[in-house]
């Protein structure tokens, strides 16, 4: 029953944000060209450009992608474009993540992405990220909904959104004022939160955010042709035959990544003997 109430509140808040005033004052494509270069579908940063262009036109959006696809880089460039459209007064930006460790990683990633901006686009860094609980002033289910604070912000960015459960997402949506933008970052293919609900994956397919979700596809950590890249793609698509073929290839390959994958598979097979389903 508690989960049903949280789902209902999420739907209501998303509908209210969708029915709110249309987004105004987003930059022209000149800003996108300055930060991402001219449109080139083959460019490694093309999916980042598309994500940024989408996010500029949405009050609530999701940017999803695997590790190393540039989610933080994209959101830093999004903030730079929003600041340019906002004028000389600084945007009120809040950064948050579900855990303290995730918040610390977000701070480090944002600082790195800020340093990579062109000099004439570098504005002040947002305030340091904090945990969602701290930002919302939430101390568990004992915190009454009527006592929850409203956030004072123009933009709220939440990283590792796949870790957010139903109740936390409902509280977050309630706390973000309708005029403020909400940007959720994460990997919809990542393991869901420990508590109830694979919320982020469901939001990506919801009628409110289906057209406000951008997927980053190019990994800047490893290529799609690498062993890890091929395994990740096969796992995400549920291609069992491809996984088996990659395993057999890895068992005779000298590539360090392939050797590592082969050892992982051997360990998984051994673990399967104790009752865990084999890949």
Predicted regions: what is each one?
Residues 50, 189-279:
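Conserved helicase motor core of P-loop NTPases
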């Amino acid at each position: 029953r508690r989960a049903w109430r949280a789902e209902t509140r999420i739907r209501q808040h998303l509908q209210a944000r969708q029915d709110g005033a249309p987004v105004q004052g987003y930059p022209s494509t000149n800003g996108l060209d300055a930060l991402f270069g001219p449109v080139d579908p083959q460019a490694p940063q093309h999916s980042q450009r598309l994500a940024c262009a989408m996010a500029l036109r949405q009050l609530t959006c999701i940017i999803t992608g695997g590790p190393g696809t540039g989610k933080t880089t994209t959101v830093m460039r999004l903030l730079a474009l929003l600041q340019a459209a906002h004028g000389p007064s600084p945007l009120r930006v809040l950064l948050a993540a579900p855990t303290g460790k995730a918040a610390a990683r977000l701070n480090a990633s944002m600082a790195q992405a800020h340093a990579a901006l062109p000099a004439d686009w570098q504005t002040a860094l947002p305030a340091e990220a904090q945990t969602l609980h701290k930002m919302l002033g939430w101390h568990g289910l004992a915190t009454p909904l009527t006592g929850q604070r409203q956030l004072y912000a123009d933009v709220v960015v939440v990283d590792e959104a796949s870790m957010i459960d139903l109740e936390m997402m409902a509280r977050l949506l309630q706390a973000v004022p309708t005029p403020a933008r909400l940007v959720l970052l994460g990997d919809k293919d990542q393991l869901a939160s420990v508590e109830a609900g694979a919320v982020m994956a469901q939001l990506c397919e919801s009628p409110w955010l289906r057209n406000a979700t951008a997927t980053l596809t190019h990994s800047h950590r490893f290529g799609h042709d690498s062993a890890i890249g091929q395994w990740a793609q096969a796992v995400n698509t549920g291609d069992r035959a491809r996984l088996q073929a990659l395993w057999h290839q890895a068992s005779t390959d000298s590539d360090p990544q392939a050797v590592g994958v082969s050892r992982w598979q051997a360990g998984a097979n051994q673990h399967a003997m104790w009752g865990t389903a084999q890949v």
